[in-house]
């Protein structure tokens, strides 16, 4: 009994594990002082050389390009497998890792067992799932983990599959019959294909939160079905739609002043470049008719909106959208909504004006700023209409040559080039957020052509945006090409290099006091880069099964950087508006100040993508008990540095550190300006929903942390009592557990998982294997029993309305 207790306790004790370094050839017990064992040989150190080529190329002495999961040699020979040797873990002695068995046999056995577990987990999840979701059939959901000593092992690909990402999808099917398809770069697809259990808990909790959300939306008259709701509204107005619109417009001089401000406002400089100021002003004077009688204050009302003989109302639509951005904000009058809906849906060939493209871009920008849906799916139709319009007009041609004689009625060449650039930018955003192939393909945009708009060496914001799109568009095109294998790890390195070379020190964006030297608009490019990088990390994690310490560290690092960018951009925009427009913060103003509204657009889509992946990944780790995983070994917050996109190989970003930073970063929103920032942001329905989702996720994580720690500490107390019944009083041990549990809060981090290899003597191997299996199963059963019971209590007793009014002073 004493020996068994020693073995059990050993499985829960921490070891000093340091991430493997590519720059070191030392074995465990060397310079790092590892406790994993002592050398078994008295001879000199033996160099452990990593074999980088695959087995096929090595046996036939062929040159291997080392691509994973399959090298080009194996692909060209139509081989079904391409195996690489496992990377040697330099911190654990080889004998302790592999034992007396040959490495190749052990790897083969591990692969067989992992495949069996995946099949069983897939069957289990299929039988137990009642939700209406459909995921990629060729790639079963992830149901297990890979041990800490592993590096990267790819699941066997189906015969003939070269690109394992192209057909990775998630079909969301509502009970109403509405369906939405998401592709590989969408976080919905990533989580649905992973089956980590987090989403099921989220659905249960969100069902409760949604009741309060709907009440809040009803009280504040917020809806995402504005366009469809227009069909239900009665219209007893005898006047035509144009005259109805005029009743809501500002005075003639006021409207003209708003147009001038739009082109002079720094918060709108990013979008006004698609317009020719002189042409827009001329269109206003030509088509917006004021009344003849001048009022006492010297101004006149707008009484009618004209069009040209060909009914080009898109000129008026551009001006009305400027008024929506600068005057109406979220409160767009119903007649104007109807006007936009009619113009967007027109199917005749008589609508292909440059003003139609400009209207669609402005409409996209307005919706992204004031009513973004979280994942961009509500903008898909706008993007498709826009791409059709710009390519039908011919903006993909050499603009300076094709339209040099058309500036009088189409606007300046520079504005036309910017319309084309914004169409490329919007197409990229939809592709990344929703997971759809680019609509602007290589036929329309070939970087090898001299007139390609993305060929720029300018150091301006526009130049950097063009170079970023030139870098990443080919990556997305390859991602959806079934005949090519996208090297996502190489793509990730190129994106990281771009950020470091083009956007300046990362600390300027992640520090609490964001540098004023950084142009605000460059936060958009950075948000795009880290968003795509996160999608690649997620695919590498789930498809290629890369689970080493370096991958874990860099994933957590990227997530925390993303959170910092979002929060710091919001705070910076708040401070700019506070200095320039203090009157915008008065309680009587129902709209966001201009720069704070801009912040919603600068980071649109990044928040939901980062949050759902981070919380799902942590939930997965917290609910895993295999391989002696014990979270209670490391309670301290360790190393952290958010000034680089990658973590040094000699550092470890623990789970506890990640949780602590995550909480502290978001909690900053509630302290700036004595809660003035959070009160102001509650004018945005998008922000309110995102904040409620974040609090819901944090509630789930806090709940699972609570019961995970309770389970581990209870078992540790029992093991210690069994080892030495006289040393500890069971009641005092239980009291310690209870006290620690009571002090737990959602902001307190959970420790980094540690996997402790067990090395019993040969005579004990069988009994030890049985005892460790039993203890893991007992821990698992006790955790889930307590967790499910506590979860039901949380669901039934929690007050969720506070998620929507927590900005108020207590």
Swiss-Prot record:
Composition bias of kind Polar residues appears in 12-22
- Record organism: Saccharomyces cerevisiae (strain ATCC 204508 / S288c)
Q: Name one GO cellular component term.
A: cytoplasm
Q: Look up the DNA-binding region in the UniProt entry and give its residue ranges.
A: 54-82
MF (Gene Ontology):
DNA-binding transcription factor activity, RNA polymerase II-specific; RNA polymerase II cis-regulatory region sequence-specific DNA binding; sequence-specific DNA binding; zinc ion binding
Query: What are the alphabetically sorted keywords of the record?
Result: Activator, Cytoplasm, DNA-binding, Metal-binding, Nucleus, Transcription, Transcription regulation, Zinc
Q: What is its main location?
A: cytoplasm
Name this protein carries in UniProt: Zinc finger transcription factor YRR1
Q: Where in the cell is it found?
A: Cytoplasm; Nucleus
What the entry lists under PROSITE patterns is as follows:
ZN2_CY6_FUNGAL_1, ZN2_CY6_FUNGAL_2
Spell out the SMART domains in the cross-references.
Answer: GAL4
Annotated spans, Disordered = 1-47, 722-742
Known function = Transcription factor involved in the regulation of multidrug resistance genes. Acts in concert with YRR1.
Q: Which InterPro entries match?
A: Yeast_MDR_Regulatory, Zn2-C6_fun-type_DNA-bd_sf, Zn2Cys6_DnaBD
Biased composition annotated in UniProt, kind: Low complexity: 23-43
**GO BP term (any one):** regulation of transcription by RNA polymerase II
């Amino acid at each position: 009994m004493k020996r068994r207790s020693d073995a059990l306790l050993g499985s829960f004790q921490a070891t000093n594990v340091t991430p493997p370094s590519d720059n070191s050839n030392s074995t465990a017990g060397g310079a790092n002082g590892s406790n994993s064992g002592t050398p078994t040989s008295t001879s000199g150190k033996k160099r452990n050389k990593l074999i980088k080529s695959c087995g096929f190329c090595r046996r036939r002495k062929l040159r291997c390009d080392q691509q994973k999961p399959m090298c080009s040699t194996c692909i060209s020979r139509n081989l079904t497998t391409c195996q690489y040797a496992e990377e040697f873990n330099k911190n654990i002695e080889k004998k302790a890792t592999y034992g007396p068995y040959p490495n190749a046999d052990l790897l083969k056995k591990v692969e067989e067992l992992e495949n069996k577990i995946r099949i069983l987990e897939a069957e289990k999840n299929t039988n137990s799932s009642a939700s209406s979701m459909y995921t990629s059939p060729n790639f079963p959901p992830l149901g297990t983990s890979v041990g800490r000593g592993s590096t990267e092992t790819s699941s066997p690909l189906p015969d003939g599959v070269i690109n394992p990402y192209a057909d990775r999808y998630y079909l969301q099917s509502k009970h109403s019959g509405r369906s939405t398809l998401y592709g590989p770069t969408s976080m919905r697809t990533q989580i649905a294909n992973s089956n980590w259990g987090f989403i099921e808990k989220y659905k249960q909790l969100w069902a409760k939160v949604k009741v309060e959300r709907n009440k809040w939306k009803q009280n504040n008259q917020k809806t995402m079905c504005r366009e469809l709701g227009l069909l239900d509204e009665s219209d007893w107005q005898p006047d035509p739609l144009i005259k109805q619109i005029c009743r809501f417009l500002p005075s003639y001089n006021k409207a003209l002043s708003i147009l001038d401000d739009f082109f002079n406002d720094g918060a709108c400089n990013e979008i006004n470049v698609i317009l020719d100021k002189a042409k827009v002003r001329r269109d206003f004077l030509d088509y917006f008719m004021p009344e003849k009688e001048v009022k006492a204050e010297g101004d006149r009302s707008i009484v009618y909106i004209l069009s040209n003989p060909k009914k080009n109302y898109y000129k008026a639509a551009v001006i009305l959208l400027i008024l929506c951005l600068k005057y109406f904000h979220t409160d767009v009058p119903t007649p104007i909504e109807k006007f936009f809906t009619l113009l967007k849906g027109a199917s005749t060939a008589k609508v292909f004006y440059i003003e139609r493209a400009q209207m669609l871009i402005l409409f996209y920008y307005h919706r992204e700023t004031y009513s973004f849906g979280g994942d961009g799916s509500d903008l898909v139709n706008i993007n498709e209409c826009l791409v059709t319009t710009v390519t039908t007009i011919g903006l993909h041609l050499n603009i300076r040559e094709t339209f040099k004689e058309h500036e009088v009625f189409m606007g300046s060449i520079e504005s036309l080039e910017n319309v084309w650039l914004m169409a490329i930018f919007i197409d990229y955003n939809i592709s990344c957020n929703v997971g759809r192939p680019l609509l602007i393909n290589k036929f329309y945009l070939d970087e090898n052509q001299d007139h390609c708009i993305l060929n720029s060496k300018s150091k301006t914001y526009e130049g950097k945006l063009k170079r970023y799109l030139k870098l990443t568009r080919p990556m997305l095109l390859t991602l959806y090409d079934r005949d090519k294998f996208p090297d996502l790890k190489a793509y990730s390195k190129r994106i990281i290099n771009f950020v470091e070379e083009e956007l300046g020190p990362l600390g300027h964006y992640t520090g609490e006091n964001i540098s004023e030297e950084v142009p605000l608009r460059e936060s958009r490019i950075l948000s795009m880069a880290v968003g795509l990088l996160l999608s690649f990390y997620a695919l590498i994690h789930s498809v290629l099964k890369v689970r080493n310490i370096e991958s874990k560290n860099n994933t957590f690092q990227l997530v925390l950087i993303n959170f910092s960018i979002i929060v710091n951009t919001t705070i910076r925009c708040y401070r700019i508006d506070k200095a320039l427009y203090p009157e915008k913060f008065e309680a009587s103003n129902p709209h966001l100040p201009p720069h704070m509204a801009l912040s919603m657009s600068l980071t649109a889509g990044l928040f939901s993508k980062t949050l759902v992946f981070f919380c799902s990944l942590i939930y997965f780790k917290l609910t895993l008990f295999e391989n002696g995983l014990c979270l209670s070994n490391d309670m301290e917050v360790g190393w952290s540095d958010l000034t680089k996109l990658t973590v040094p190989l000699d550092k470890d970003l623990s789970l506890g550190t990640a949780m602590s930073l995550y909480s502290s970063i978001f909690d900053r929103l509630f302290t700036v300006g004595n809660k003035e920032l959070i009160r102001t942001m509650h004018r945005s329905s998008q922000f309110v929903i995102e904040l409620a989702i974040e609090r819901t996720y944090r509630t789930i994580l806090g709940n699972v942390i609570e019961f995970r720690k309770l389970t581990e500490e209870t078992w540790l107390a029992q093991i210690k009592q069994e080892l030495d019944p006289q040393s500890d009083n069971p009641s005092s041990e239980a009291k310690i557990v209870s006290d620690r549990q009571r002090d737990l809060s959602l902001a307190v981090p959970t420790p980094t998982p540690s996997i402790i290899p067990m090395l019993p003597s040969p005579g004990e191997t069988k009994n030890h294997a049985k005892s460790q299996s039993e203890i893991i199963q007992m821990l698992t059963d006790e955790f889930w029993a307590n967790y499910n019971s506590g979860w039901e209590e949380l669901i039934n007793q929690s007050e969720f309305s506070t998620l929507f009014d927590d900005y108020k002073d207590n």
